[in-house]
A protein has these predicted regions:
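Conserved ABC ATPase "signature" region
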Residues: 100, 104, 111-129, 181
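Helix-to-loop junction immediately C-terminal to a conserved catalytic motif
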Residues: 56
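Hydrophobic anchor residue at the start of the ABC signature
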Residues: 147
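Conserved ABC transporter NBD signature motif
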Residues: 64-76
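The feature captures the beta-strand-to-loop junction immediately N-terminal to the Walker
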Residues: 41-43
Length: 262
């Protein structure tokens, strides 16, 4: 049995105070197993990204705790890599130097960092582009750089906040396949946030469906499908339908409506 890698225990997160107080997450509990690909879906504003930021150490819970290998997360660390939705690249640095940036800050010897970065650049399909600058790259290529940079520290957990959300449909589909290929080679623990049920069902070992704000776990759907997955397969469509069924009412709630009303 796989061990629990990340555990959220009775998490509550609020922003602001008084009349401006917003409860983003309430009574949130979750276990993510080692080497598992876990995907969070839920309505806009339900706290998916907030939870990811707390696992990263960028935000702290108002109450409760998040554990990594049984130890509380209190700050960012090299054991967690983060891929943002936007292409957060340094425009004055080449692909290679974007990937090595964090390693340079950490004091990793230049040649060691370069060798590691070149290996990752090849893995994400950008060999030959190591000397290119971000403005010359397509959106999909930029996000490949972001993935390589997040993996440069060899983190145990990879956190991904809607990384393909701004890509066109065809590029997004290609990137999903490439991400699974990388994950199968490196077997990282992945926590991935998306609005797309299609994407979630294609990628995940386990899908966490969150309620409307304040976010909590509404349901957990195991995706017992071989990879690569067929978007038109009966079992795939059944699982996708199950997730949509859990999600529909929460989306309506987030819009201030109830089922059956217009």
């Amino acid at each position: 049995m796989k061990k629990v890698k990340v555990q959220a225990i009775d998490i509550n997160k609020t922003f602001g105070g008084g009349n401006d107080k917003v409860v983003a997450i309430s009574d949130f509990n979750l276990e993510v197993k080692e080497n598992e690909f876990t995907v969070l879906v839920g309505p806009s504003g339900c706290g998916k990204s907030t939870f990811l930021y707390m696992v990263a150490g960028f935000e702290k819970p108002t109450s409760g705790k998040i554990l990594l290998d049984g130890k509380p997360i209190t700050k960012p660390g090299p054991d967690r890599g983060f891929v943002f939705q936007e292409f957060v690249l340094y425009p004055w640095r080449t692909v290679l130097n974007n990937v090595t940036f964090g390693l340079e800050i950490a004091g990793v010897p230049k040649e060691v960092g370069r060798e590691r970065a070149m290996h990752l650049i090849e893995m994400v399909g950008l060999d030959g582009f190591e000397n290119a600058y971000p403005h010359t790259l397509s959106g999909g290529m930029k996000q490949r750089v972001g993935i390589a940079r997040a993996l440069a520290y060899d983190p145990e957990v990879l956190l991904m906040d809607e990384p393909f959300g701004s890509l066109d449909a065809q590029t997004r589909k290609i990137m999903q396949g490439e991400l699974i290929g990388i994950w199968e080679k490196m077997k990282k623990t992945v926590i991935f946030v998306t609005h797309s049920v299609i994407e979630a069902t294609y990628l995940a070992d386990k899908i966490i469906v969150m309620t409307a704000r304040p976010g909590r776990v509404k349901g957990i759907v195991d995706v017992d499908l071989a990879r690569p997955r067929d978007y038109t397969g009966k079992k795939y469509l059944r699982i996708r339908g199950e997730v949509l069924g859990l999600l529909e009412e929460e989306v309506m709630k987030s819009l201030g409506k109830t089922l059956g009303k217009t």
